[in-house]
């Protein structure tokens, strides 16, 4: 990940103190690809990074990832990958909180087919964060129903944005 992508990933990771499990990043494997998983309860990102096998199941504290982000320059050659994760695992904080069971959320969308729907309400800022994180000019969104998450799949990762509830005509806000 370049500096912009790492900054976007940090926007997906929860920042407050009231939900400590969400302030960490899980190193995991999805369909045989190692990844960093972060969520803030509204968005979830699983960014594929090769070479993390020995740390699967471990977590990185947000503050350690922030320090790596601050240390990066905007040069093309300055990227965050397996070597930087190794550095954090060797020198970073020991995280012992339990990461949420995100797989129960994303499993239905790893193979399922999207469905057509008439309308969905969303916050475009969340899409911009995912677009920056994925590093491409456009996004393809898979929709699975009005009250289901919006799912973005690419070679770089799997990203989920939870829908906002639609207000029905005449419904009080």
Model-identified regions with their sequence ranges:
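DNA polymerase processivity clamps
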Residues: 1-173
């Amino acid at each position: 990940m370049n500096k912009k992508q790492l900054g976007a990933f940090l926007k997906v990771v929860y920042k407050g103190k009231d939900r400590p499990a969400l302030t960490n990043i899980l190193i995991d494997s999805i369909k045989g690809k190692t990844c960093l998983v972060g969520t803030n309860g509204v968005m979830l990102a699983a960014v594929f990074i090769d070479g993390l096998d020995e740390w699967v199941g471990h977590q990185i504290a947000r503050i350690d990832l922030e320090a790596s982000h601050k240390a990066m320059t905007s040069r093309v050659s300055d990227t965050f990958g397996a070597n930087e994760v190794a550095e954090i695992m060797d020198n970073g904080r020991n995280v012992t909180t339990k990461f949420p069971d995100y797989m129960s959320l994303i499993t239905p969308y790893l193979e399922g087919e999207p469905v057509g729907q008439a309308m969905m309400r969303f916050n475009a800022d969340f899409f911009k964060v995912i677009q920056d994180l994925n590093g491409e000019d456009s996004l393809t969104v898979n929709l699975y129903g009005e009250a289901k998450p919006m799912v973005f799949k690419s070679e770089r990762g799997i990203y989920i944005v939870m829908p906002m509830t639609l207000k029905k005509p005449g419904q009080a806000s």
